[in-house]
Amino acid sequence: MEASAGLVAGSHNRNELVVIRRDGGGGGGVGGRRAAEAKAACQICGDDVGEGPDGEPFVACNECAFPVCRNCYDYERREGSQACPQCKTRFKRLKGCPRVAGDEEEDGVDDLEGEFGLDGREDDPQYIAESMLRANMSYGRGGDLQPFQPIPNVPLLTNGQMVDDIPPEQHALVPSYMGGGGGGGKRIHPLPFADPSVPVQPRSMDPSKDLAAYGYGSVAWKERMEGWKQKQERMQQLRSEGGGDWDGDGDADLPLMDEARQPLSRKVPISSSRINPYRMIIIIRLVVLGFFFHYRVMHPVNDAFALWLISVICEIWFAMSWILDQFPKWLPIERETYLDRLSLRFDKEGQPSQLAPVDFFVSTVDPSKEPPLVTANTVLSILSVDYPVEKVSCYVSDDGAAMLTFEALSETSEFAKKWVPFCKKFNIEPRAPEWYFQQKIDYLKDKVAASFVRERRAMKRDYEEFKVRINALVAKAQKVPEEGWTMQDGSPWPGNNVRDHPGMIQVFLGQSGGRDVEGNELPRLVYVSREKRPGYNHHKKAGAMNALVRVSAVLSNAPYLLNLDCDHYINNSKAIREAMCFMMDPLVGKKVCYVQFPQRFDGIDRHDRYANRNVVFFDINMKGLDGIQGPIYVGTGCVFRRQALYGYDAPKTKKPPSRTCNCWPKWCCCCCCGNRHTKKKTTKPKPEKKKRLFFKKAENQSPAYALGEIEEGAPGAETDKAGIVNQQKLEKKFGQSSVFVASTLLENGGTLKSASPASLLKEAIHVISCGYEDKTDWGKEIGWIYGSITEDILTGFKMHCHGWRSIYCIPKRPAFKGSAPLNLSDRLHQVLRWALGSVEIFFSKHCPLWYGYGGGLKFLERFSYINSIVYPWTSIPLLAYCTLPAICLLTGKFITPELTNVASLWFMSLFICIFVTGILEMRWSGVAIDDWWRNEQFWVIGGVSSHLFAVFQGLLKVLAGVDTSFTVTSKAGDDEEFSELYTFKWTTLLIPPTTLLLLNFIGVVAGVSNAINNGYESWGPLFGKLFFAFWVIVHLYPFLKGLVGRQNRTPTIVIVWSILLASIFSLLWVRIDPFLAKNNGPLLEECGLDCN
């Protein structure tokens, strides 16, 4: 696809394409090796390395060839550590160098004339060099060389059999007289033969010498033997597993090949010492809950029956909610990846990369709430990712059709030509320039290149200029012209009307487009804005993502997709390789539908007041799900398998053959299971299984065909697919695009070679038209699923119902980082949107309570999905339960009768179990107590505000058809750090928790004053009520701090609420009259001074 083709706009009902031209450019060069070696400088003293006796550059270390001159080499051996400064390998003694302590014992090695047989020619360097070269740089006796005579090969004896194909370095040492002529002289290393027709010779030795002279029997020899034995055991183990070619050919790359055959990842179960006590306390807590509820139900409070009934109902609901949340954590696991093995298998140096291509999706809607600079940093981090350039394509979806986003992306593509080579040259992290230059670290650490400081300063200056240009575009966009925006060539911007515009595609960078400043190729960068027309349901973000799926299938069709929010940049450039360790693993990869990474955030205050990091969910719940069927999809930072998004069933797992007569005697089979096998034998022969594609007709279980039933790569497989699959059914399912339908049959990706770029561009415009999805399965069984504003839950749920599994990957360096809402109001609105999406799923046909039975969804995985759509309903009992303490303190009643010793035991046992469960959960997961406690606090804050409103809004939408508007969460800019934390924005979500706080404060004051007036007898029952009230206040404390805002700055709304509720409190105070002693007897009326 030509990157300079220009912006292409089109419509589904207009048979035309409009192309707006743009410009492009590129260039590059290399040097030579020999001159560089000749001028190599010693890394110790700075002098030239110089040449050795053979005329080649002097090499001190044969392991790493670290540049060291002869003088420094002699000094380090004599006075220094005697080791290479780089690889720490001990320097070996070279010819002509003085001996030092620690050199290996060699007979006569100090006598050059006797060692090399110079015969008086020790001053002839040419003779010495030729002798050493013929000896393969070994310590042989050059003078003993005789004219070459082939020596009969003496193979090793292995298990009593002769093996003739053993490589030379594995032959045994043999005396020189073996071979009838001793053509090998007294050499102790094999002779190098240039003629391949000459048989390989055995290693000869002098029988008059002791074997220790050749290294046999020494400590070093024993260590080598132990290492060799371990290697043989490892090779034997791999051989038993049936992997590879084990003919003993002695290939030098064999260790690397062994490593490449190893698994690319492995599961790391939580140690039993940490997880078993956790499981035990869960079981104990269940038992204690049973006894606790038995007591609560059997001992009602007669004088406060309503309070007792409400509390019991709430407690039962909390217990059920805890069970739904707890049991998916029963089998938590962690995972490790091996990037070196991935490279050895799929990305060998000097060979074309075999890594799978990946399409990156970035979605944005409103540049006023999602700053273009934030989006630009995300795109730059993608373009500079550590992955083969030809395998990366980045698609940016602009669902707001904003010219500001288009122009910012154009500037980003130009800056990428400088930024991408800088990142890859110096291997910096992270590769989003805004966050890289904000790092408060010593950037000189571990950077030895002298040019790094200079180039970093120049790059920072270029980035500041880039920011100025982006901010200028933002400032210009604040004033919209009356006639609308126009492009540089004078044509009107096609997206002036956000709700009525054609589809637009612009390829900024690509394989044939602009190159970077060093002349290297850049990844493809494509701008996409789908068509919008009045009267069509565009399905918000889910519809935009499905449009990107179709466009990318037409233009690049990578088998894997990565979707990111515009404010989530790649923090670990090797994140995609981490995902490929699972996706491309030949053992487990075929059944993996997506790899989910945890969300990590920048710019959050140290205390994380509103639990923005959500550590408990990402480090506890998701690890638990990974041990079942995989984590749920959270909307960003996820690598998908394209075929799984197309609604295909997961490949069927081949079951191992059962133990039948192949491994048991015939008489055993006849006796033990004769009836069963006899019955099978008498049945009709099974018809031959045909490998075909099929569609399931059930509406709620209508995935496409199972990919596992197609043999990829078989002769004529593609022809069979096209012939077997009904074309009409495919078009009805995927839409009326023959190019796109054909791409869905390519499991390993790739575009159609017969299609021209012009035809692909036309198809790309067609598949993003607003009417393309009509009467298809898009949003129902294919792609991102419609029906909820939290499309991520539905999408992952449908994949798991098709039998796929997902993977949770937590690299040591966070893969992606994003921005989180800092102020209280934005955080509550974010939680409101999530909860509203769950309520919508609860009332839809895809509710996990009744959808997907009989499919591939596992039982505990269903528990998790049920919990994810039921949790907003917990807000109703939570609100009631948080109100009870204030009512109890104001009325003098309580939700429990007077406790007996047995009842106190159950109450104390339950509290201890709750406490110990939290401690053990933090212990096995590694979550800090601060994060765990913030999560508990915000569970109450969100429950009595956002979740409560989500339930009522969801009911209004279902029952009355009142739709709620989707609000994009504002992304952080580059203002003062944590300035948004103290910003107060009034919203109705603040009313319920504010009321709860004031009610409980009033209740505490009323209860204490009542106890003071009634004497010490009432203090005992008061402690239980006060504990109950303080439990509520402590959980709402972060909300109280957010409500007050900065010090000495109380919001007006708080003052108004305080006055209003103070008035109510005054009326209650008069009604309670706490200063009047309460008696059960008759009231005495004051009738004057003399009452008698």
Swiss-Prot record:
Enzyme class of the recorded protein, top EC level: transferase
UniProt: UDP-alpha-D-glucose binding residues: 363, 369-370, 399, 540
Chain positions covered by the region annotation Disordered: 100-123
Cellular component per GO, a single term: plasma membrane
Acidic residues compositional bias, start-end: 103-116
Record-listed Mn(2+) binding positions: 541, 565
Metabolic or biological pathway, per its Swiss-Prot or TrEMBL entry: Glycan metabolism; plant cellulose biosynthesis
Identification of the protein by name: Probable cellulose synthase A catalytic subunit 6 [UDP-forming]
Primary location class: membrane
Topology of the protein relative to the lipid bilayer: Multi-pass membrane protein
SUPFAM superfamilies reported for this sequence: Nucleotide-diphospho-sugar transferases, RING/U-box
Cross-referenced CDD domains: mRING-HC-C4C4_CesA
Active site: 399, 792
EC number of this enzyme: 2.4.1.12
Record topological domains on the Cytoplasmic side: 1-280, 325-868, 923-937, 1009-1019, 1071-1092
Role according to the record: Probable catalytic subunit of cellulose synthase terminal complexes ('rosettes'), required for beta-1,4-glucan microfibril crystallization, a major mechanism of the cell wall formation.
A GO biological process held by the record: plant-type primary cell wall biogenesis
Cofactor needs: Mn(2+); Zn(2+)
Subcellular localization: Cell membrane
Chain positions recorded as Zn(2+) 2 binding sites: 61, 64, 84, 87
Chain segments annotated as coiled-coil in the UniProt record: 453-480
RING-type ZnF: 42-88
Cofactor note: Binds 2 Zn(2+) ions per subunit.
InterPro entries, per database record: Cellulose_synth, CES_Znf_RING, Nucleotide-diphossugar_trans, Znf_RING, Znf_RING/FYVE/PHD
